[in-house]
Amino acid sequence: MDQKTFDKYVLNTYTRQPITIVKGQGMAVWDDKGREYLDFFPGFGAGNMGHCHPKVVEAIQKQVTEIIHVPNVYYNNAQGELAKLIIENTFDGQVFFCNSGAEANEGAIKLVRKRNPNKKTIITLKDSFHGRTIAAVTATGQPVYHDGFDPLPGGFEYCEANNVEMLKSMMNEHVAALMFEPVLGEGGIVPITVEFMAAARQLCDDYDTLLVLDEVQTGIGRTGKLFAYQHFDVEPDVLTMAKSLGGGIPIGAFSVKREYCDILKPGSHGSTFGGNPIACSAGIAVLNAIADENLLENALKMGNYLKEKLEALKSKYSIIKEVRGIGLMLGMELTIPGAEIVQQCLKKKVLLNCTHKTVLRLMPAINVTKFKIDKVIKVIEEAINTQLAWGQQL
């Protein structure tokens, strides 16, 4: 289908790049004209394993020949096995499955609100992102995502990231939960500090408040740990996840510590397709591949290597303000809008992303190699030089 016909029938809610992707393998994708691209932001954060990982493909193919969907009024082995894997690799509790990060966060919001009738306020962070459904978008601390959707649900307040004193001033006995990402993704790749994370946990303990960590983007090995909270000496009470958990298949989930598992009862929450056997089989394959292929170690090692290369660029170009992030979730903040750099890289067959207007977001597959990193760094530097030369001509 040509892009003009596509645009005629598909609602225009995305700013699309002018390429039609038809195939992917590893870190490479191909368009409908046969051109190959190096994808350094696969699946918008949902491609931690790269495209079409062989073990994920095999698991999906096997499951689809057996049964495609099982309603949640019956038992489903794949769902149970994936839940067991998640709990064994995090903290004791139970898991609810859905289809996306927004749904996972909505479920977490329902759980913390239902726990205590006198605790309804949820504190999130400014510049956060939690999804586009009505409660999740209200939890998102960016007014641009709220515009036009009023009246929004009440009960949400927003704290500055890493501002411990502000957080302390906002806490009271009516706060049901603190909810935030260990690294703000859409907010510009801003890691939460050790001090803020520790204070959040302590304040939750002091006020009988639940700590909800949104690991939709930071989870599944992205930061060099299976979940980013594992870099801190802290455990959440509720953990949300999605994106890369399915290796490209839609899936979402939230896990809850054992002591809070009886809050949601039959009929209080549900999802028709949540825990679908195909999605859960893919999730099992993803977690097993991460362990079998030592991908957490690779994410840490390659994350350090990529960060060093970005810091080297920063030392050469004054338009690079800061490099930040954890593992292979890195951002390079510029003093100029990043969209044109992304376009220059696209022309050179490298796919990148710009978030928060000036932050280049680099989140390659966690099995990335030094060779691929070097290639992308070269292209980014060429794009910067092109942009600088263009600016001098104005």
Where are the predicted features?
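Conserved N-terminal phosphate-binding loop of PLP-dependent enzymes in the Aspartate aminotransferase
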Residues: 1-394
